[in-house]
């Protein structure tokens, strides 16, 4: 009988393709429409005794309730027609309640594929119906009915197959279902009866999923063979599927044996009528309708009685609609009865089956033949779908774990679940397959299926594995697979569904073509074809799939049903092992349990059983199963091992008799065996690696493991991983750089093209091309005329046009252009003119032949053009470095673009210029003027930075070799960017520039261009200020050119603009934005690791540009020679400081020492206005030695005095801001030019109450001082330096000690560096209140009274940030200080670094206690010139009058310590209520400008941040603010590089000129130079480290002092 291919074959490819590995489904891709899925007689022994013979009569199968789904599938299958069909192996396992429900539910959407999972209703006569299905609920629909194979009953039945084998009555049902028209001798009688039935049963499979567990369908009511019946059923199912398009509702109805027999008879009669009607003999429409009505009535009655009332009702309602046959009801009914409950009795003849029965009137029985055979296969398929078959496949393959024969319900449910997702398409496919399956096994339970496989297949298909054999294997495999899948997948059901689908699909995919081709070609005429079809299928399977696949498929049989079976074996996880099926009840239940947990041992055991079963079944189905059995058996190596031990140790006595040597020999033998085994395994793995399976998807976890395990031979090297990041970053950076370069080039080209005002060269090119074309044509015509005149006349266009009067020769002659005058002068002969023209031809259309290239330098022509604009030497440099040549100005190099810059008038030379290759920073069409500017800028750069070679040198070109003017310019420009440089400090810097400039670090190549930019920009901004010989005009180009790079590098507002494509920018942006510190400087301070801009500026230059108006009202720093600076007026507000109040030094943010006072010889008076709040009870022992009003505010180390000497914020701000605004260069000078520094040691000897100058050089000679920060406040990231012990080693314990916790907060306040020292003195010692923190103070530190908090505004190097109290008291200030000036950075370590020592110690330093003050005074060298005591004009209400600062001792270096304003807040607990702040008001110059300056001097936040409970010493806050510009050192010291300029490394420190240098830049790490600095500053740093012996006064200094002075 010919099937309608479109009905069930067409869908296979569309939706049923499984993505599973080909082996997964036994190489059969079970698809509802796939003929490969058609169960064949050889699918496998339904029972040990019966072969599933399509030729057999339906009577043999009659006993089995055919649960034919409306699509011809078994009821269970109908219920889940699509899923079961698609998931061949899975549907077997899916007998659990969920799977049934799913199947039934999915049947609506997914047509039942009879072949996918023939609904084998396990008539568990031997076992409770629920057990086989695993249905625990007796009320469930399947409680009394055997689940349909579609729901995985088949798999359960595989376990139950053994039982089913005995239950021949059920087998006849299976046979009845499976007889695909092949009337076997056994079934012939029944076939006569059943073929009509089966043909009607195909309808019945749709409606009759009800299969009484009793094998009552054995009575074949029609002579039709099983094959015919199946064919009819399939045709009907196909019709229904086609009509319903997956709308068929497959309903399983429990039918009593009597009803089943009745239905079988009705179906057989219906089939007969349909056949007759098809043949056209008679029209039995009424009879067919009556039969269908009866069948529907039976099903309806049973459905009404069944637990699934809704499905039954839906079926009843849908029976009338053949298309919608209550598939939903059946599916729901099945879902209600999970496959697990072994209710194989569940006889659900879907209403679709009834409708089919009715439709079968239309459907000719002839279709039944092929379906019948197919039906036979579906029973086999049912077995195959069962986990056992899947397991067989896997077991044979050795994939016992892969047996997807999950619990019957589980696998089927999984299948159905998987395929419910694509229900519509699959349902159609499944419906078609289901038809076949319905014919084959739709009514069969797994038992029935197994039994039929064993019995039915036994006779026709001896090769097929006996159902019994398959049962144990399937049962075991199912359990194993289920267990494995349960672990492997979400559940055995799901696993089965997924895996089996994949496996089945793949297996079927490989096998499908064969079976499909066979069916399509031979049309699979019926049971007679079944054996051949099956054999062909098996053969094809063998050919297309490996033995494992074949074995899996052979487990049931490689018929379409077998294909399904194969799918299930692939689904072994979800499928039921045959062995389990042999134990239907226990298997269904156990499989469910196993599905949840995989039992490897059980699986292997099952595998062996499966092998045995497979072998037995193979005897019938064929060698394939046999091979599978072998493979399955092999996995059970344990058995052999067990045998070996027995042979080795047959008797314990023998074991006892074995001597040690013998035992050793045995062990050695075993070891060798094991070694060999391992070697073989490894070799096998290596062989697998040679031929990896990389195409098919993984079937399951075991497949993943097996496939991937061999790869362990490949070692995973760490190296590629370790350096990947860096390599990738490097490569990507390079790629990005190249891409940007190319993009810039393109942009420049486009820009030039856009900017071109003339298209002359393009026109010339076009004209030339046109002329050249005409010329060549003319030459060709001439040649032709000379050679072959006739041809020429015949073919010439000219002649033709002339003849046609289209060309007027005379007129053309007249229009010929005359020879140019310059050519007329030449007496050219005929051939000479063209040759002369050739000289002007374009080469390759390159009108600009001498095109500039980054790789090849301009030809002499272009050079000559550029030479007038750029010096040849620059050119050489430029050409020496092609990249510089690309940019008009190379910011890094600082040379103007030397490549010829075509002016707009030079059209041809435009392309010649290297602009094609220039980068973004180039400006394309530079006019000659611009080029001149660039040239001048280049010269300027050369003066400042030296030639490119010099810039390339590791050390920057020494400033000594730079013109003074250049230095001044750069300093002036850079100064605004140095917030902490005061005018005075700039002056000092100028004085010390000589020493500074030679240090290579002073000019860092990276910063040099920027510095130049800054200087130039600053000069442009403040031209009067810069006495530089270089004109601002020159500097401007330099600035502009370098600015682009600066902007890229720093991102400062002046530099931010991108100048790449445009001519050099004006200096306006720089003028507009004059930051106290260049943004790049700030960034550098943030990043300690960033290269330092080391610009050494001659003091003279700074002084020239400095406006030293140091009055309180001075907002701007007047340009004055630092030596002539006005005395700093420091306004000290001595106020009682509450313990909680941090010294309001924030306001007096210690900006970079604004003025580095010149050498001590000319101490400048520091006018400090001390406003002492009368509340201060503790007398401030601030002895101001007013030897000379030194501008440099003394670094006041307040002894426990609550008096807080802070310069009035307004004044300090004014001063700072004015200085910063007016001359940042001055600031830098001041910073750099502290000739005499006071060491941060306790400069004040309490006894003497005078500051003792300490030669700074001793302290810092030849090394960078490493200050340790006890606790870095979060706000000073850039100031954080690892704390070091006295030896300079990093201190492990960063937390300050309880007793000596000097928290130094270095904050930028109003542009000044404010250092707040919050010292937690030794709680045990009262002295702490009187201890002077050895905060670097100007030459005289005033030991304030115990409660005196002195805030000294020193325009000098800010106090070391390391001494900043790390506590958040100064948190805001810290934030402000995030703007990190290098100067500030250096200052944080050494407040004296940049403070001009010329400033006399301000009188603000009062020795609170004679002991401390003397110690401090003696040990703290006064950086200020001794003649410059700062008079503290502080109302000392309750404070001890500040002691006059002792003149620095002659032996000390008279370097005015460039101590930034240091606000020392020493709040003693006693003085908390009446703490007077002595704020030194430094005019806030930077505060307004510096974004980082956050708080005012007395910011309550700071105070609150300070430990409120601390004694005044604990609250000792030293805010070092740059000294007033007024403090001018009498003799300019070689300016120390402003701290900002030299962050860590100051080459100047190492420079020989540094003898009188102020404290060099403090570095994190110890210098290679001697540890003198550390030893000197050890106390200062130790307290920060918490390792200091501060509690015990060091060198006579009270333990509370922040710095103890070493003698």
From Swiss-Prot:
Disruption phenotype: Embryonic lethal. RNAi-mediated knockdown results in gonad distal tip cell (DTC) migration defects whereby DTCs do not migrate to the midbody of the hermaphrodite and as a consequence this leads to abnormal gonadal arm formation during gonad morphogenesis. RNAi-mediated knockdown specifically in gonad DTCs also result in a DTC migration defect in which DTCs migrate away from the hermaphrodite midbody on the dorsal basement membrane. RNAi-mediated knockdown in a unc-6 mutant background results in failed gonad DTC migration to the midbody of the hermaphrodite. It is found in: Nucleus; Cytoplasm. One of its GO terms (cellular component) is nucleus. Expressed in gonad distal tip cells and gonad sheath cells. Residues 858-871 have a biased composition (Acidic residues). Residues 872-886, 907-917 have a biased composition (Basic and acidic residues). Residues 206-218 have a biased composition (Basic residues). Residues 81-93, 179-191, 349-371, 379-425 have a biased composition (Polar residues). GO terms for molecular function: copper ion binding; primary methylamine oxidase activity; quinone binding. Residues 14-52, 67-93, 167-222, 326-425, 459-478, 549-594, 845-931, 1017-1061, 1141-1241, 1319-1378, 1392-1445, 1517-1607 are annotated as: Disordered. Keywords: Cytoplasm, Developmental protein, Nucleus. GO terms for biological process: amine metabolic process. Residues 195-205, 327-341, 585-594, 1333-1354, 1395-1419, 1584-1601 have a biased composition (Low complexity). Pfam families: GLTSCR1. It comes from the Eukaryota. The keyword Nucleus applies. Its main location: nucleus. During gonad development, involved in distal tip cell (DTC) migration from the dorsal side of the hermaphrodite body to the midbody which allows for the formation of gonad arms. Role in gonad DTC migration may be in association with integrin related proteins ina-1 and mig-15. This is Abnormal cell migration protein 38. It comes from Caenorhabditis elegans.
């Amino acid at each position: 009988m010919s099937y309608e291919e479109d009905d069930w074959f067409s869908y296979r490819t569309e939706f049923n393709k499984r993505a599973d590995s080909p082996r997964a489904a036994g190489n059969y891709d079970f698809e509802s429409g796939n003929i490969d899925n058609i169960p064949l007689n050889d699918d496998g022994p339904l029972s040990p005794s019966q072969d599933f013979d399509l030729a057999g009569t339906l009577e043999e199968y009659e006993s089995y309730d055919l649960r034919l789904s409306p699509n011809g599938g078994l009821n269970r299958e109908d219920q889940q027609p699509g899923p079961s069909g698609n998931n061949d192996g899975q549907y077997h396992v899916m007998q659990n309640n969920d799977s049934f429900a799913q199947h039934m539910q999915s049947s609506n959407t997914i047509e039942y594929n009879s072949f996918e999972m023939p609904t084998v209703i396990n008539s568990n006569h031997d076992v409770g119906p629920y057990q086989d299905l695993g249905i625990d609920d007796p009320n469930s629909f399947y409680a009394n009915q055997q689940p349909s194979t579609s729901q995985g009953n088949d798999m359960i039945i595989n376990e139950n197959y053994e039982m089913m084998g005995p239950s021949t009555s059920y087998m006849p049902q299976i046979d009845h279902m499976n007889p695909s028209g092949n009337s076997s001798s056994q079934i012939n009688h029944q076939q006569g009866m059943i073929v009509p039935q089966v043909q009607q049963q195909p309808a019945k499979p749709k409606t009759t999923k009800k299969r009484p567990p009793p094998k009552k369908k054995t009575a074949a009511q029609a002579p039709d063979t099983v094959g015919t019946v199946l064919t009819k059923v399939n045709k009907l199912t196909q019709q229904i599927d086609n009509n319903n398009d997956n709308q068929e509702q497959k309903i399983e109805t429990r039918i009593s044996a009597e009803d089943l027999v009745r239905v079988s008879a009705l179906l057989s009669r219906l089939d007969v009528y349909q056949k007759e009607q098809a043949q056209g003999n008679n029209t039995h429409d009424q009879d067919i309708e009556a039969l269908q009505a009866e069948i529907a009535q039976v099903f309806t009655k049973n459905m009404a009685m069944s637990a699934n009332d809704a499905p039954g009702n839906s079926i009843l309602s849908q029976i009338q609609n053949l298309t919608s046959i209550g598939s939903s009801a059946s599916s729901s009914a099945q879902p209600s009865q999970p496959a697990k409950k072994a209710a194989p009795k569940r006889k659900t003849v879907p209403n679709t089956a009834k409708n089919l029965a009715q439709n079968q009137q239309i459907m000719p029985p002839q279709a039944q033949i092929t379906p019948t055979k197919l039906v036979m296969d579906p029973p086999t398929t049912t077995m195959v779908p069962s986990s056992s078959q899947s397991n067989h496949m896997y077991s044979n393959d050795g994939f016992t774990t892969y047996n997807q024969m999950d619990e019957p319900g589980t696998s089927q449910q999984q299948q159905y679940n998987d395929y419910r997702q694509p229900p519509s398409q699959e349902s159609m496919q499944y419906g078609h397959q289901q038809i076949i399956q319905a014919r084959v096994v739709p009514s069969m339970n797994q038992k029935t299926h197994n039994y039929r496989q064993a019995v039915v297949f036994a006779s026709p298909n001896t090769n097929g594995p006996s159902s019994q054999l398959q049962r144990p294997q399937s049962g075991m495999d199912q359990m194993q697979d289920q267990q494995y899948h349960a672990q492997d997948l979400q559940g055995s059901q799901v696993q089965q569904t997924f895996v089996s689908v994949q496996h089945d699909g793949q297996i079927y995919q490989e096998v499908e073509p064969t079976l499909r081709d066979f069916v399509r070609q031979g049309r699979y005429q019926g049971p007679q074809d079944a054996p051949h079809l099956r054999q062909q299928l098996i053969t094809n399977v063998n050919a297309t799939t490996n033995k494992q696949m074949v074995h899996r498929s052979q487990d049931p049989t490689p018929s379409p049903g077998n294909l399904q079976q194969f799918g299930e074996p692939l689904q072994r996880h979800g499928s039921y092992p045959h062995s389990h099926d042999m134990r239907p009840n226990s298997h269904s239940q156990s499989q469910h349990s196993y599905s949840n947990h995989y039992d490897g041992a059980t699986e292997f055991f099952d595998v062996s059983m499966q092998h045995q079963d497979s072998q037995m079944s193979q005897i019938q189905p064929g060698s394939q199963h046999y091979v599978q059995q072998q493979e399955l058996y092999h996995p059970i190596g344990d058995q052999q091992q067990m045998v070996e031990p027995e042979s080795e140790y047959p008797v314990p006595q023998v074991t006892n008799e074995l001597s040690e040597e013998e035992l050793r020999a045995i062990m050695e033998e075993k070891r060798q065996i094991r070694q060999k085994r391992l070697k073989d395994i490894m070799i096998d793995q290596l062989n697998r690696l040679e031929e990896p399976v990389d195409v098919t998807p993984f079937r399951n976890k075991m497949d993943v493991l097996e496939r991937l395990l061999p790869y362990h031979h490949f070692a995973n090297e760490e190296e590629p991983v370790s350096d990947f990041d860096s390599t990738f970053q490097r490569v990507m950076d390079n790629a990005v750089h190249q891409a940007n370069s190319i993009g810039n080039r393109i942009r420049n080209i486009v820009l030039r093209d856009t900017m071109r005002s003339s298209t002359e060269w393009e026109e010339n090119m076009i004209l030339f091309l046109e002329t050249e074309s005409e010329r060549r044509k003319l030459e060709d015509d001439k040649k032709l005329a000379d050679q072959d005149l006739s041809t020429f006349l015949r073919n010439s266009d000219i002649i033709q046009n002339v003849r046609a009067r289209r060309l007027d020769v005379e007129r053309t002659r007249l229009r010929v252009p005359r020879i140019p005058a310059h050519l007329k002068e030449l007496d050219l002969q005929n051939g000479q003119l063209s040759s002369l023209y050739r000289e002007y031809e374009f080469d390759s259309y390159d009108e600009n032949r001498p095109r500039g290239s980054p790789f090849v330098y301009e030809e002499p022509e272009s050079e000559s053009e550029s030479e007038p604009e750029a010096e040849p030497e620059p050119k050489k440099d430029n050409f020496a470095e092609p990249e510089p040549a690309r940019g008009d100005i190379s910011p890094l190099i600082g040379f103007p673009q030397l490549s010829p810059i075509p002016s707009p008038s030079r059209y041809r030379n435009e392309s010649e210029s290297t602009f094609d290759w220039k980068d973004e920073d180039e400006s394309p069409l530079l006019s000659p003027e611009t080029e001149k500017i660039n040239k001048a800028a280049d010269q300027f750069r050369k003066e400042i930075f030296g030639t490119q070679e010099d810039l390339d040198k590791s050390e920057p070109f020494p400033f000594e070799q730079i013109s003074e003017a250049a230095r001044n310019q750069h300093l002036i420009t850079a100064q605004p960017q140095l917030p902490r440089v005061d005018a005075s400090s700039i002056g000092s810097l100028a004085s010390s520039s000589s020493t500074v400039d030679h240090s290579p670090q002073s000019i860092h190549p990276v910063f040099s261009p920027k510095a130049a930019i800054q200087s130039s920009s600053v000069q442009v901004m403040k031209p009067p200020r810069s006495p530089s010989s270089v004109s601002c005009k020159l500097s401007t180009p330099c600035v502009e050119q370098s600015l682009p790079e600066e902007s890229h590098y720093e991102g400062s507002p002046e530099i931010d603009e991108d100048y790449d494509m445009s001519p050099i920018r004006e200096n306006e942006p720089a003028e507009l934005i004059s930051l106290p510190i260049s943004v790049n400087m700030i960034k550098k301070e943030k990043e300690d690791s960033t290269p330092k801009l080391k610009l050494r500026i001659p003091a003279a230059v700074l002084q020239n540009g400095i406006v030293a108006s140091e009055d309180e009202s001075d907002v701007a720093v007047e340009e004055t020679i630092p030596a002539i600076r006005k005395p700093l007026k420091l306004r000290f507000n001595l106020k009682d400081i509450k313990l909680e109040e941090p010294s309001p030094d924030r306001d007096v943010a210690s900006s970079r020492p604004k003025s580095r006072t010149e050498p001590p010889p000319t101490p400048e008076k520091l006018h400090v206005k001390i406003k002492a709040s009368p509340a201060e009870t503790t007398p401030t022992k601030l002895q101001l030695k007013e030897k000379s009003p030194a501008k440099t505010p003394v670094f006041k180390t307040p002894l426990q005095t609550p008096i807080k000497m802070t310069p009035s914020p307004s004044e300090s701000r004014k001063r700072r801001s004015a200085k910063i605004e007016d001359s940042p260069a001055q600031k830098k000078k001041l910073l750099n030019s502290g000739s005499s520094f006071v060491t941060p040691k306790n400069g004040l000897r309490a006894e003497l109450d005078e500051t003792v100058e300490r030669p700074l050089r001793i302290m810092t000679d030849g090394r960078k001082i490493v200050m340790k920060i006890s606790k870095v406040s979060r706000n000073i990231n850039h100031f954080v330096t690892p704390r070091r012990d006295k030896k300079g080693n990093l201190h492990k314990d960063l937390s300050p000690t309880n007793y000596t916790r000097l928290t130094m907060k270095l904050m930028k306040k109003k542009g000044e560096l404010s250092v707040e020292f919050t010292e937690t003195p030794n709680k045990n010692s009262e002295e702490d209140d009187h201890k002077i923190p050895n905060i670097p103070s100007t030459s005289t530190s005033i030991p304030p009274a115990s409660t005196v908090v002195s805030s000294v505004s020193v325009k000098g190097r800010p106090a070391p940030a390391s001494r900043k109290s790390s506590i958040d008291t100064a948190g805001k200030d810290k934030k402000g200080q995030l703007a990190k000036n290098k100067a500030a950075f250096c200052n944080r370590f050494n407040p004296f670094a940049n403070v001009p020592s010329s400033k006399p110690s301000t009188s603000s330093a009062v020795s609170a206690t004679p002991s401390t003050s003397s110690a401090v005074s003696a040990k703290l060298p006064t950086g200020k010139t001794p003649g410059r005591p700062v008079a503290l004009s502080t109302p000392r209400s309750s404070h001890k009058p500040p002691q006059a600062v002792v003149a620095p001792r002659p032996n000390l270096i008279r370097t005015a310590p460039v101590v930034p304003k240091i606000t020392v807040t020493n709040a003693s607990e006693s003085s908390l209520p009446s703490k007077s702040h002595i704020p030194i008001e430094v005019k806030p110059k930077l505060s307004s400008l510096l974004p980082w300056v956050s708080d005012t001097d007395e910011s309550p936040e700071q105070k609150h941040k300070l430990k409120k409970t601390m004694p005044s010493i604990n609250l000792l806050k030293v805010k070092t603010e740059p000294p007033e510009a007024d403090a001018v050192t009498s003799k300019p010291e070689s300016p120390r590089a402003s701290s900002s300029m030299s962050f860590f490394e100051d080459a100047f420190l190492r420079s020989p000129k540094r003898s009188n240098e102020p404290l060099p830049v403090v570095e994190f790490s110890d210098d290679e130079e001697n540890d003198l600095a550390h030893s000197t500053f050890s106390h200062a740093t130790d307290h920060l480290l918490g390792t200091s012996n501060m509690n015990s006064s060091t060198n006579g200094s009270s333990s509370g002092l922040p710095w103890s002075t070493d003698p």
